[in-house]
Curated annotation (Swiss-Prot):
GO terms for biological process: proton motive force-driven plasma membrane ATP synthesis. Pfam families: ATP-synt_D (PF01813). The keyword Transferase does not apply. Belongs to the V-ATPase D subunit family. Keywords: ATP synthesis, Cell membrane, Hydrogen ion transport, Ion transport, Membrane, Transport. GO terms for cellular component: plasma membrane. This is A-type ATP synthase subunit D.
Length: 214
């Protein structure tokens, strides 16, 4: 790899100038890709931190919800709880869009709240327990966080893929493309110097022959 050169390059001055320009662009591209890689990694870990916090919050809310639901079942009876559950009007609405993180398009999912109060859920006060209201509220809030988690985890997957792709491009430039360009530049410079020496030697021979004839 250390001495590998680009294929199909002729040792001419034009090729040398083109390769020097290409080397500058490759080095600049390498620097920009490293910056992108580092920014993506930083963003990746910042978002990753949010995942654990959201998961912990969901677990707490679900624990409260199931505890309150159990209390409601004891207070109201299983059948009454089931009737109340069946009367609830489902109305989860999602707004899905996207945003760009360092050129990576990631999802943005917004949920419009299912229910904001007891009355909007569809079951009445009569024959229901306050524990059921608390359980419903905690379940609804858990759903919102679970939707957010879906957005976050999808974003993490997409960023991880882009980080790996960017790393491969950085490594290719750093360990393959740029070294080959530099090796080819060195080869052409050396070959041009040899050609100049050969040309100079030939000119000396020609001059000597002319001088001898005179």
């Amino acid at each position: 790899m250390a001495n590998e050169k680009l294929d199909g390059i002729n040792p001419t001055r034009n090729e040398l100038l083109n390769l020097k320009d290409r080397a500058k662009l490759s080095i600049k591209g390498h620097s920009l890709l490293k910056e992108k890689r580092d920014a993506l990694i930083k963003e990746f870990f910042e978002i990753l931190d949010r995942v654990q916090g959201s998961r912990d919050e969901v677990e707490k809310k679900l624990a409260i919800a199931y505890s309150e639901l159990n209390k409601a079942q004891i207070d109201m009876g299983d059948m009454a709880v089931k009737r109340a559950a069946l009367s609830v009007r489902e109305s989860i609405e999602l707004d899905i869009s996207s945003r760009s993180i360092m050129g990576v398009s990631v999802p943005v999912v917004k949920s419009r709240a299912t229910h904001n109060d007891v009355l909007s859920r569809g079951y009445g006060f009569a024959g229901t327990s306050a524990n059921l209201d608390v359980a419903a509220k905690e379940f609804e809030e858990s759903i919102k966080i679970i939707i957010e988690l879906g957005e976050i985890e999808k974003t993490i997957i997409m960023l991880a893929r882009e980080v790996e792709a960017t790393k491969r491009r950085v490594n290719a430039l750093e360990h393959v493309i740029i070294p080959r360009i530099k090796n080819t530049i060195s080869f052409i410079e050396m070959r041009l110097e040899e050609m100049e020496r050969e040309s100079f030697a030939q000119l000396k021979v020609i001059k000597k022959n002319i001088d001898e004839r005179e």
